[in-house]
């Protein structure tokens, strides 16, 4: 059917490049967009605007439309830098309203299997920020994956000689969870990271 509509075939192919979108979902999305031309136009306009306006902050490397970003230019506590893998991770921390310092987005994690080395990340820029500023603490908030843990250990080795406090986000049992349903590795981390009451 799609061999007679190369433009539609291309749209489906582009949609399939998005994470979690397979052939059937891409087809469904393409046909939905074609049914409502105003949605198609709005989506095209939004994609064009994102491409034209969104960039990485020159200080923390988070995605932003303002450079430096509102967090870097907004008078936040610059003595503490929270290091995250992605802008999405930064947004999750912001939604928690538990942190009020500055950020540094690595734009990935060390992954030798995928060919991502420390030089491919924004680690050099982090070290330069620390050397230039009055940073007292770096909070490492990489994901609790093999890549995130590898990145955290690498960062800790790079940062400790600088004489600043280096901390890692705690990990443990999620709020509202029954212990019987939590995986053994998480229970181990929670037990090791227990605190006084």
Swiss-Prot record:
It comes from Trichlorobacter lovleyi (strain ATCC BAA-1151 / DSM 17278 / SZ) (Geobacter lovleyi). Residues 79-174 form the Toprim domain. InterPro entries: DNA_Rcmb_RecR, Rcmb_RecR, Rcmb_RecR_Znf, TOPRIM_dom, TOPRIM_RecR. May play a role in DNA repair. It seems to be involved in an RecBC-independent recombinational process of DNA repair. It may act with RecF and RecO. PANTHER family: RECOMBINATION PROTEIN RECR. Keywords: DNA damage, DNA recombination, DNA repair, Metal-binding, Zinc, Zinc-finger. SUPFAM superfamilies: Recombination protein RecR. Belongs to the RecR family. A zinc finger (C4-type) spans 57-72. Disulfide bonds: none annotated. This is Recombination protein RecR. PROSITE patterns: RECR (PS01300), TOPRIM (PS50880). GO terms for biological process: DNA recombination; DNA repair. One of its GO terms (molecular function) is zinc ion binding.
């Amino acid at each position: 059917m799609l061999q007679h509509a190369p433009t539609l075939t291309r749209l489906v192919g582009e949609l399939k490049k998005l994470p979690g979108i397979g052939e059937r979902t891409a087809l469904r999305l393409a046909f939905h967009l074609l049914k409502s031309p105003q949605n198609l136009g709005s989506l095209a306009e939004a994609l064009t605007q994102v491409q034209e306006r969104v960039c990485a902050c020159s200080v923390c490397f988070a995605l932003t439309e303002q450079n430096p970003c509102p967090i870097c230019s907004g008078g936040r506590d610059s003595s503490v830098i929270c290091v995250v893998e992605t802008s999405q991770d930064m947004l999750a921390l912001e939604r928690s309203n538990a942190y009020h310092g500055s950020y540094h987005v690595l734009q990935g994690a060390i992954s030798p299997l995928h060919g991502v080395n420390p030089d491919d990340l924004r680690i050099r820029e982090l070290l330069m920020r620390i050397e230039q500023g009055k940073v007292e603490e770096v909070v490492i908030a990489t994901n609790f994956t093999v890549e995130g843990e590898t990145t955290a250990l690498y960062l800790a080795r790079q940062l400790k000689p600088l004489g600043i406090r280096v901390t890692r986000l705690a990990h443990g049992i999620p709020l509202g969870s029954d212990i019987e349903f939590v995986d053994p590795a998480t229970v181990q981390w929670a037990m090791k990271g227990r605190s006084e009451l």
